[in-house]
Amino acid sequence: MKCANAAALLFFVLCDIGVHGGEIVAELLHSNVTVKWQTDYERQTVDFSIWFGAKTPDLLFLGFSDFGDMNSSDVLMYDNVKREIMDSYTNRDYKIIPDLSQDFQQLRRRKDHFVVRRKLTTCDSRDYAFQRGTTQFYIAASFGYRNLVDIRDKKWILDKKFGKVIEGPTDQPSTDEGVSSLERDVQLVIVNSNSPDPVPNVETTYECIIRKMPFDTVHKTYHIVRMEPYITPGNEHLVHHMEVFLCRDEVEEWSGNCNDPKKPKKSKSCSHVIAAWAMGEGPIHYPREAGLPIGGKGKNEYVMVEIHYNNPELHKGVMDTSGFQFYVTGLLRIYDAGIMELGLIYSDANSVPPNQKAWAMNGYCPSQCTQNLPEEGINIFASQMHAHLTGRKLWTSQYRDGVQIGDVNRDEHYSPHWQHLQQLRPMVRVMPGDTLVTTCVYDTRRRSNVTFGGYGITDEMCVNYIYYYPASEVEVCKSAISNSTLRAYFSQRHGMDGKTMKISDMYNGVKDWSNGVDEEFYNVLNVGNVNMNCLKSNGESFEFKSKDPRQGWENMARPRLFSGSFIRTRDRFQCPAINDMINFE
């Protein structure tokens, strides 16, 4: 494609792809509605084709939202009786109002569908700016009613879906990396429970399944070239995310609660992460030149699948045999691949005060840790970001010599209900000595208590799993605000016992985070020292290399970083969009 005017439109011009398409299907009781789109990056347009099922609605509402709010959203209305479209929006009170600027162009109308076109960004403050990352779609239909002016009206039949109108350079893999062209000797291996087990009727449960790989890993090395979830049909709403670990020791096969005292003691050796998956994601493809190595170490290889069940409605008696499936080949590829975990340490040190609109926290992977990467650097070919219910924006940036040189991955409209692996094309090259910073922005305005960092669904995480080659020894590169920084703050500012109190008790000891207390603490988080996890696959820390013997991974100064000279985001003041209106509430 041509890239004329690319500099002026850098916030959405993507010169390495021509056209991208997608599709969602809304289930609207009387009839399904299918929304297809085709994005043309050269023309900077997106064409939506809306197809009706068995019954055509009288009114159709197609809304676009960053974080799932039906108010202050961009809307396309279709009146099937008049056969007319109307560019509209919803205000704060959920009222549907025609837009002063009609930016949708109707291209075609048939009995069973219609097609419209719009610019990706119109610089209309009532229009949604389509950007890289997640777009949340609201599709509502009215059968028999036409004079509906409030989207909350019970006469609407509503469904919510997720999609990516702009894939960016993180497009899906081409078919030559798919199953159709996998090596001829590929084996499909499913690791799950041998018999159905009931999902516990508690909100958060972690179940572990340990299995021996069913092929000769004693004498031969294999490559895993694709992985994907194996979910029991009907249980998609319960399986929130999974992690897959390779075990260093030979372990007896077992399944049960991960915290069960009967869990084999040698399962502690199952610590090498080889895959991670979260609700809404598809398969993990490896590029044709790389595969994840397994076997060849003179022993049987065991894997452990850890499943996070999220059961907020406390369902009883739901049987589940979910797990993970692997595509394995004995035809080794050029490179061994690895997976690395970036972001924040799972710790109550990384906690968010209540009633915060956009609370950002940074997880550091500093140069002292990336110095352990291969001399030629690594190529990141996929990225998988993960947070829980209050996560709104997630991204990882790359710095060299303290200056930002680009992003690894970014989602400005993150949803925990639709998570996805981003295939990075072109791949991102990270060199020894680079710094990677993973940022998560949280919205806790609906919470009255502190949201702690941790494993539960109501706790928070900030993680980016990066898939890369060639493999290195670095498996975890994460940080947390140092305990000494927190203890000093809570002791000096709030008069707490900084020596004996638990970190969680200190957070809970602050009864009022308003009147500048939150702003003051936010500054502490952004300048205070950090504790680092720079870990090998066996859980051991790398040696901290410094001429100063007093320095180490504990209580270290955070990296000094500076923004690069490029602009990768739309200027919300020069080119407004409805995405920005929340800033004025």
UniProtKB/Swiss-Prot annotation:
Pfam families: Cu2_monoox_C (PF03712), Cu2_monooxygen (PF01082), DOMON (PF03351). It is an enzyme of class 1 (oxidoreductase). Keywords: Copper, Cytoplasmic vesicle, Disulfide bond, Glycoprotein, Metal-binding, Monooxygenase, Neurotransmitter biosynthesis, Oxidoreductase, Signal, Synapse. One of its GO terms (molecular function) is dopamine beta-monooxygenase activity. Residues 1-21 form the signal peptide. Cu(2+) B binds at H386, H388, M461. PROSITE patterns: CU2_MONOOXYGENASE_1, DOMON. Its EC number is 1.14.17.-. One of its GO terms (cellular component) is secretory granule membrane. Disulfide bonds join C208-C258, C247-C270, C365-C477, C369-C534, C440-C462. Glycans are attached at N32, N71, N449, N483. Catalyzes the hydroxylation of tyramine into octopamine, a neurotransmitter involved in pharyngeal pumping and egg laying. PANTHER family: DOPAMINE BETA HYDROXYLASE RELATED (PTHR10157), MOXD1 HOMOLOG 1 (PTHR10157:SF23). This is Tyramine beta-hydroxylase. It comes from Caenorhabditis briggsae. The gene is tbh-1.
